Structures are given as C-alpha cells and as structure tokens.
Amino acid sequence: QTMRLRHVVNATGVALHTNLGRAPLADAACTAVQEAASNYTNLEYTLETGARGSRTAAVEELLCVLCGCEAAFVVNNNAAAVLLALAALSRGKGAAVSRGELVEIGDGFRLRDILEESGARVVEVGATNRTHTDDYERAARENDLAVLFKAHTSNFRMVGFTQSVSLRELARIGVRYGLATVADLGGGAPLDEAAYPFSGEPSISRALRDGADIVCFSGDKLLGGPQAGILLGRAELIGRMRLHPLARALRIDKLSLAALEATLRLYCDPARAGNEIPALRMLCTAPETLRARAVYLNKLIEQEGANCATEIISVKRPVGGGCAPSALLDGFAVAVLPAALHVETLEARLRAAAPLPVVARISQGRLLLDTATIRDDECPAVAAAVKAGCVL
C-alpha cells in the first residue's frame, strides 16, 4: 500500500511551505537519521564512563559554539519552547507582552493562549499599533512580573502609525527591574541578515547581543533542520527549564536530534551550509539559475508533447513558514495553459499524479510551476505529470 505521508513535488515556489513539511533535510541529516533509526545509539549513554548521559548534550554544545551563548536546550517545537520558558520562569507571575505582538499562528492557535497554558499571567501592554518603553516600565511597577516577553511578528507586518520597543530597549528595562527578557524569534535566522535575500528576520546572535536572557526559535524554518524548539541564553535560566517537569513531556526524539546535530555541523562552515542545506540553497538561488531550470522544464514538457501552451515567466515568491511576510523573492516559473480542459482540472490532476504528486498554484488563469522549489531530478516527473494531466 502507498504511504499516506509521501514525497510530493513542491512547485509552489514557497521554500518553507508549512503544509508541505517546511524545510527538507540536507543529505547529511538524512544519513544521520537513517543511522540513528536503524541502530542502537548512545542517546542517553556516555561512552567514556559508561554512565547515563544527556540526550541533548551534543546539540547544546554545538549551539553554544555557533551562537555564542552560555547554554542551550532543545525541545520538540518552538511552541513547546515558549511554553517551557514561561512555565519555568513565570508560572504564577506576570509576563508582559505588547498587544501588537499577540499573534495568531497556523491552524488558529494564538500566542496568548499558549502563554497562559504555561501558568503565567499575561499582562498586555501598549496599544495594538503603538507600544512604548513607558508601557513596559508601568507594567513592571504595577504588576508582579517575572518576564518581559517579545514575539517577533514573523507572519505579518504592521505599517502606518506604529511604534514598537526594540529587543535591546526591552532588555535594558529587564535589567533595571530584575526581570528576564524572553525573545521568541519564530523562524530565527542562524546567519547574519546580510546572508539572506530578504530583510526583517532577526539573527539569533544579534538577539543575544541585544541582551535577551532567553531566545527561542524553530529548527525547521530558516535553520533548515528538523522540527525542534531551540532555547538559548543564560545558563541559570536554561538550567531551570531543563529541570522543569514539562521538559520531559516536551522532549525531542532521537531521530530529530540526529538530524539537528548533522544540520548544525554544516553551519560550522557557512559556505557548506549554503550549498548543502536545501532550504537555505532554495532561498538564496540566483534568479538566472532558476530561469535555466525553467528552460529545462519547459523543454521536457514540449518533448512530452503535452496538449498545452507553455511560457517561461518571471514570478515573485514568498519565503513561507511565517518568515519575512513582506518579502517577495525573484524567480521564474513555467506557466501552463491546457488546451482542452480547465486549468483547475489540471491542477487537481497534478495533485493526484502517480507515483509523484505535484503541488502547484494557479495565477491569472494559468498553472504555474515555480522552479525555485522543484529539484532538477524532479523535472522529468513533473513534465510527465503535465502531459498526463492535459489529456482530455
């Protein structure tokens, strides 16, 4: 029987497509997963002493070296990281957060609800569109706070008459009032902002330099690794999270740990990371390379003799995963107009294609095959699916 969870071609151009599993893993990470899955491992065993060890020690050491932090901890996703941080640092006390940062994420889940599940009392500060340093200081004076919480509004942008408090300013307030500053970066850029063809996503190291006591982010977004929630920051605070009962409930599994360690090791050489981590490579591929792939795909479709008209067009594509929502990256796509049926019918047939479904999008009456997220080795299967899908 065919597996329900299966390989599909992502022809949408969205590199971090949440519904399609976000970041594909690097070959090194896939090899590490295979090795861990098919064998016993030293997951919680210290080979040097024969004693029990920490399952997350290896990735924590790598994270501290790569990000320049005192300590690190890893759980199963970023929502879990936020939950654990607030449960360990602010249960029964207040956590101040700007009203403009109380976002709703995918599937209808709201940040406020996650914060409240930790046992912290959410103290909203400021107005929806404008929050000032005075708002946080007033909250610190008038409430029994333990945490100043800052959420990066990674899935939307507010423009116009707006004002926000920077992480650096917030951290200074935290020091003044003896409060922990927790920053949820969402995607979390592991490289400096200049390494990406878009702006607006804060780098992890920058957040730590700006004074955040705790920084958390996802493993399967800009990092390009497996699903994971990564916590970095002050050793004393990380230690409290590590010993919290929720840490057991939220712990990361061995296969994700294997993939995460392999991914982090690639970042020891940023150039290698850019070449070998698929999500990073797709986001940074030059438009001329994408055009060449579109030419190749278009030629294959023509050679198949598909009953359709095709054209290579320039397109704009989002990053995905709630990252850089205002950024649209340059790319190229093959636009397909079937000759004998509706384009919606072709789109549905591609989704049902066997053995390899193709997920594309429709724009201005044509089906677009965006080459930013189609691998070269997938192009023949895409061309064959287009031919089969255009048959009346």
Predicted feature residues:
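Long, charged amphipathic helices and adjacent flexible linkers at domain junctions
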Residues: 47-57, 314-323
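A short linear hydrophobic-aromatic micro-motif
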Residues: 4-5, 217, 356-361
